[in-house]
Amino acid sequence: MYRILWPLKLWDSAMTDNDLSKIQLLILDVDGVLTDGGIVVHSDGTESKRFSVLDGHRIKLWQRSGGLTAVISGRETAATTIRAKQLGISLVMQGCLEKLPAFEQLLKEVGLTPEQTAYVGDDLMDIPLVRRAGFGVAVANAADELKQYADFITERKGGEGAVAEVVEHLLKKKMKWEELMERYRV
């Protein structure tokens, strides 16, 4: 039995360090990226999700370094709104069944080009954004069809530190990681 692997584009072969240093906007899907993709539906009809604290802390580090963060999600939930507010993410677009128009609108609002963005996704509806962003990322447990278009596939699964992995790498390539770590070495 043979296993066909999707063509992988590695960080350093897909983009130079200089290209990665141009990334200013980190755009995230929610279900399957910031969460493990599971949704708990309570008897009163409300939903809850589990978010990674590790991802949340790295998002705050990204913002502290001057980076912008946005969310583009296919679903609209109160849990996403609340978590985005907790993390200081004001660029939140929910209920986007077609994500590419939301991506283009977001770029107009912030005055950036696709090359200045990184997008992290996990499923089929993320393919257009992974292809369009300057740096397209698929989480470890993403759909195989998405992985074939990604510049990088994380080692960690969605909701389990995948976003933290991406942020750490970007900050290291932007030469900002060590500076941010100084506050923890006191």
Which ranges hold each PLM region?
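Intrinsically disordered, low-complexity regions enriched in Ser/Pro/Gly/Gln/His and often acidic
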Residues: 1-4, 55, 170
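Non-catalytic pre-domain segments flanking phosphatase-related domains
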Residues: 1-28, 176-186
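A ubiquitous, low-specificity "background" feature that marks scattered single residues
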Residues: 3, 8, 37, 42, ...
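Alpha-helical substrate-recognition element adjacent to the catalytic core
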Residues: 11, 16-101
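Mg2+-dependent phosphoryl-transfer enzymes with acidic/Ser/Thr/Gly-rich catalytic loops
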Residues: 45-49, 86-87, 91-93, 100-186
